[in-house]
Amino acid sequence: MKKLEDLKTKIDFTKIISKNKTFRVKFVKQGDVSLSSQEVEPYLGEVIFNQFKGKIKASMDNPDYIVYVYLFNSNCYIGIDYSGFDLSKRDYRVFANPRSYHANINYILLKIAELKETDTLLDLFCLSGETGIEAALYLTKRSPNYFGKKNFAFNKFFKFNFDKVDKEIKKTKSKIVLSSPTMGDVKCAQKNAKIASVEKSIDFTRQDIEWIDFKFKKKESVD
């Protein structure tokens, strides 16, 4: 996409957005892009309005649907925002250590490591506990947004059976150990894990590295 007229999309929004609902357009860009949100948002808004032949309203403050336009160089992506907030954020990070990796980075690393049930996970420098907490959430099938279900944007336009998903939450057979030579880090990790409701799935210990072997049985391996 190089010019504004290219936004005359073939997408039929009448099949995506329900009648008698409100909407707004948000524009995000990266790379070599000359277009601005002041140009793109009203333009696509008018395209959508015309598709509905005026039988839809725009709302800048509290729309039912947010139509996202993401432009990266000449590539344009258009979609509906189902979350309504940044999914990389974690509400449990109340006692955060500035040296910790962001929680979503920890989750990605756990996926790359192919963490699975019955594995043992040890974090020697747990800081504020994100690695172990993300592992516990993943293995117990508990959503990081378990307590924020009502905040999802899709609640405005369709009903989702959260109870069915919550029934999949289980105990994990894995051993997750969060350790640190500093008691302050251990306490922060414990508090964050409690906020995330996974503190019972994690062992917390203040240990110097040279003594950590005593935390595990002789035949027990650490993954």
Where are these regions (language model features)?
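Short, surface-exposed recognition loops or helix-turn segments adjacent to catalytic cores
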Residues: 54-68, 124-125
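Non-catalytic nucleic-acid substrate-recognition regions in nucleic-acid-modifying enzymes
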Residues: 1-60
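Conserved S-adenosyl-L-methionine
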Residues: 101-211
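Short SAM/SAH-binding signature in class I
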Residues: 220-223
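SAM-dependent Rossmann-like transferase core, predominantly class I methyltransferases
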Residues: 78-112
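C-terminal edge-of-domain segments
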Residues: 67-83
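Short loop/turn motifs enriched for small/polar and acidic residues
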Residues: 26-30, 70-72, 207
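Short conserved loop adjoining the S-adenosyl-L-methionine
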Residues: 211-218
